[in-house]
């Protein structure tokens, strides 16, 4: 069973190509025009062990918002497509990940029901500008990214920032925690021969 997908998404604001392989090794080729976001998506690929290609050409002369959002939408769509009917997966994933002073818990349920709960970021985190290139990545985009991925990927996602002071660490730890939780949730369980739901469908 090959769990791969390719999504192409084009609007008046961006053109996005996303390719994923859920059974990869974390190989990545990411270019969105937003340097910090590239760094975060690379971390996601590496720690989820998902092979990930992202090529986005967006209206970064305005700001990063459309580019970041549209990439997240396409990534969610690709993850959903690659999962297929979800036969044989573990379904649930729970990871708590540190990065120096930052600590984040992420929990995933590949339920087919989109939901995202995002809590715990310190006051002012949403206004922080991150990255050494223009346009900067605004801290408020992090919640928006996870909401977009969860809603278009059709899974429930809870992200709780438990500790953190350095804004870069706070964002990066979230991406790594979500990656590890997702990795566990989509892993194939040799004892699960069907779809992991009493309803028979996810």
From Swiss-Prot:
<keyword id="KW-0456">Lyase</keyword>
<dbReference type="GO" id="GO:0004424">
    <property type="term" value="F:imidazoleglycerol-phosphate dehydratase activity"/>
</dbReference>
<keyword id="KW-0963">Cytoplasm</keyword>
<keyword id="KW-0028">Amino-acid biosynthesis</keyword>
<dbReference type="InterPro" id="IPR020565">
    <property type="entry name" value="ImidazoleglycerP_deHydtase_CS"/>
</dbReference>
<keyword id="KW-0368">Histidine biosynthesis</keyword>
<dbReference type="GO" id="GO:0005737">
    <property type="term" value="C:cytoplasm"/>
</dbReference>
<dbReference type="GO" id="GO:0000105">
    <property type="term" value="P:L-histidine biosynthetic process"/>
</dbReference>
<dbReference type="InterPro" id="IPR038494">
    <property type="entry name" value="IGPD_sf"/>
</dbReference>
<dbReference type="InterPro" id="IPR000807">
    <property type="entry name" value="ImidazoleglycerolP_deHydtase"/>
</dbReference>
<comment type="similarity">
    <text>Belongs to the imidazoleglycerol-phosphate dehydratase family.</text>
</comment>
<dbReference type="InterPro" id="IPR020568">
    <property type="entry name" value="Ribosomal_Su5_D2-typ_SF"/>
</dbReference>
<dbReference type="Pfam" id="PF00475">
    <property type="entry name" value="IGPD"/>
</dbReference>
<comment type="pathway">
    <text>Amino-acid biosynthesis; L-histidine biosynthesis; L-histidine from 5-phospho-alpha-D-ribose 1-diphosphate: step 6/9.</text>
</comment>
<protein>
    <recommendedName>
        <fullName>Imidazoleglycerol-phosphate dehydratase</fullName>
        <ecNumber>4.2.1.19</ecNumber>
    </recommendedName>
</protein>
